[in-house]
Amino acid sequence: MASFRTLFACVVILCCVLWSSMARYGEDMEVETEMNKRDVGVACTGQYASSFCLNGGTCRYIPELGEYYCICPGDYTGHRCEQMSV
C-alpha cells in the first residue's frame, strides 16, 4: 500500500499535469497554469537542477515530501519529461 507521502506527491503532480492539459484550451488559462505549476515546491538545486529532468524540463522539489518532479515543455510528458506527447 502506498504511503501518505507518496500518495500526496502523486496528487500534487497529477494536479500539475491536469492544469497543463487544460492550458491548451485558452491563452489566459495557459498563463495562469504556468504560474500555478511553478508555485508548487521550490526550484531544485545542485545535481538535480541540471540532471533530474530530461528534454528541457524544469526541476521542482517539494520539501515537505522530499520529492522531486519536473515541469515539462509542451512536447514532453512523464515524471522526468522522458516521453514525447502524442
UniProtKB/Swiss-Prot annotation:
Residues 40-82 form the EGF-like domain. The keyword Disulfide bond applies. Residues 24-36 form a propeptide. GO terms for molecular function: toxin activity. It is found in: Secreted; Nematocyst. Has both toxic and EGF activity. Its EGF activity consists of rounding cells (morphological change) and inducing tyrosine phosphorylation of the EGFR in A431 cells, but with a lower potency that human EGF. Belongs to the EGF domain peptide family. This is OMEGA-stichotoxin-Sgt1a.
